[in-house]
Amino acid sequence: MTQFAADKPYIVKDMSLAKWGRIEFDMAEIEMPGLMALREEYKDSQPLKGARIAGSLHMTVQTAILIETLTALGAEVRWASCNIFSTQDHAAAAIAETGVPVFATKGETLEEYWDYADAIFHWPDGETANMILDDGGDATMYLILGEKAENDPSVLNHPKSEEETFLFAQIKKRIAATPGWFAKAKAAIQGVSEETTTGVMRLYQMQKRGELPFPAINVNDSVTKSKFDNRYGCRESLVDAIRRGTDVMMAGKKALVFGYGDVGKGSAESLAGAGARVYVTEIDPICALQACMDGFEVVRAEDVIGEMDIFVTATGNKDILTVDHMRAMKDMAIVCNIGHFDNEIQVESLKNYQWTNVKPQVDLVNFPEGHRIILLSEGRLVNLGNATGHPSFVMSASFTNQTLAQIELWTKGENYTNEVYILPKHLDEKVAALHLDKLGAKLTVLSDEQADYIGVPQHGPFKAEHYRY
């Protein structure tokens, strides 16, 4: 048995699933026009030639189309999932069959998760990655924390969660096996593109502290990501996940959505579309007012906790649903999270109670008061744990942004310092334009006089950087 996952060519659940994965890839490509257009546009110039990309993002069918786009543009890629439950095993097998090293299985342990995160940085010839494509910031954090530990081992002395216990153990294991590796690996990185709200928050925190070691592109805040993937994606995938997990009818049920950002908005719309009566909690008066204007009642959780049938956290914060909240819920209330990390719900504290596993990613938690809750995906991303995530079309927009961000950082690295950037408006509009034909949309074209009148180029960009959409 090898010491590290990195020593193996790949780790997937079952290579016999590859044929099934390839069939789904063929279907997904039809729904992902942005990525397919980039393959055609850049097939000759190969802008990612020489890039060694460490990818940490849900290993789904849609991600497979992203991976094959990156390699079609010249990149070498190694991949792991950014969530222990989100891998689609047939997709992982089909990618491994192409020769791309993949380290991902649905239901992997936390120990395996961090071993796989390590594996994406190691090339067989001894080279390390020179680019990161991240979702949630775990791959980026692994390198940065690892280098800190090389200089000061005490930073690993006091893990604050089960997750940190395994992360710290993996870092110690790598330092013991390859002293100085983290400093070398971090120094080789030319840039990172970050997919999601939580990971972007980590990057901005590092920038504020002066600790960001390489340029970063915030893909999440591209309009064609956050206003589409986060909202319209969740609008389709949340109810899908709850239905697959519970078979509960949502019409007439009371649902409480924590947070009314883009993900919360999509989640509330998803539940309302299924006939649920939706309530919202918020800390931000602007988002709270938006929720009211959209027809949702804004409440405090403690005032309604015993009335609700369904609870969905979507804040990106921690300790949103506490054990005390869950002890006060009605019998068989459904509890789930659609934010990136599992600490929105105090799942670790629930380990003190009796659990009954119903089926994969569905558990009953029994409280001494005599009631139970239905916990989905152990508090991790419900739409990827209990279902298959967002539809291919909306992910095409997100992943087209990711590909453009990788090209930008790799080919124009000299233009970027160690700060967090957003893709320019003309690329955001390009991503949108690449998806219009699929929907049969036809743009109106400004006349020269009209363009002059409103002070924009005839063919865009059409909005100022501060425009909010």
Swiss-Prot record:
It is found in: Cytoplasm. GO terms for molecular function: adenosylhomocysteinase activity. Its cofactor is NAD(+). Its EC number is 3.13.2.1. The gene is ahcY. It comes from Maricaulis maris (strain MCS10). HAMAP family: AdoHcyase (MF_00563). NAD(+) binds at residues 196-198, 230, 259-264, 282, 317, 338-340, 383. Belongs to the adenosylhomocysteinase family. GO terms for biological process: L-homocysteine biosynthetic process; one-carbon metabolic process; S-adenosylmethionine cycle. Substrate binds at residues 60, 135, 195, 225, 229. Binds 1 NAD(+) per subunit. One of its GO terms (cellular component) is cytosol. Pfam families: AdoHcyase, AdoHcyase_NAD. It catalyses: S-adenosyl-L-homocysteine + H2O = L-homocysteine + adenosine. Keywords: Cytoplasm, Hydrolase, NAD, One-carbon metabolism. May play a key role in the regulation of the intracellular concentration of adenosylhomocysteine. This is Adenosylhomocysteinase. The lineage of its organism: Bacteria, Pseudomonadati, Pseudomonadota, Alphaproteobacteria, Maricaulales. Pathway: Amino-acid biosynthesis; L-homocysteine biosynthesis; L-homocysteine from S-adenosyl-L-homocysteine: step 1/1.
